[in-house]
Structure formats: C-alpha cells, structure tokens
Amino acid sequence: NKSIGSPVFFFFKIGTTQLVDVSQMVNLDELARVAKAYHLKISVVGAADSATGNDGINNPLSKSRADYITQQLMVRGIDKSMIISKSEGGIDEYSPITANRHTAVRLFVQ
C-alpha cells in the first residue's frame, strides 16, 4: 500500500484521550471526506510519551487514543474495514515531549 501525503497528528492532553484542542477535529472531517471520496484505507497509530509513564500506563493509553480516533472516523462514515488501527505505547521520537502524546493518521491507496 502506498501512503498519500504526510501523516496528520492529533495531540492529546497528558494521560487522557482528550484532544489538546478540539479544533483538530476539522482535520479529521477532511481526512474522512477524502478517504470516502477516493476509497482510501486509513492507518491510525496511537502513542504516548515515555517520559511520563511506564509500559503499564502507556500501552493501554496509546491503544485508547488510536481507538478514539478510529471511532471518530467511523462516526464520520468510514467503514471499520477501511481502518487499520495500531498502538506504539510510550515513545520519545519527538521534541517537545508533549508531541509524543498523539495519534497519527495516514491515508493509503489500496
């Protein structure tokens, strides 16, 4: 499968599945619109920051974040069969630390 464009990141408040800014949902609206129009698959990957939690906290939290975005895509008319959802647990890939509290969404040609 070939990824289209760059990932779109949705950032969360520490330890939660609450978005830092609900205006990020406009990005989700647009991703869903494009995915439906062109019959694209969607990859959803949840993450947490490893600096503020252990695996016991971060693994389920990153899954919950991915599940939240997946559910929001389904509310916007995306069939679950078109979504591939994964979680990474705690990561330290981005600076500042808060940038690791995210779910990344990518569109793919089938």
Range-by-range predicted roles:
Residues I4, K36, I97-A99:
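Solvent-exposed loop and beta-edge segments used for protein-protein assembly and interaction
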Residues F12-A48, T70-V75, Q110:
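Periplasmic peptidoglycan-binding/anchoring modules of Gram-negative envelope and division proteins
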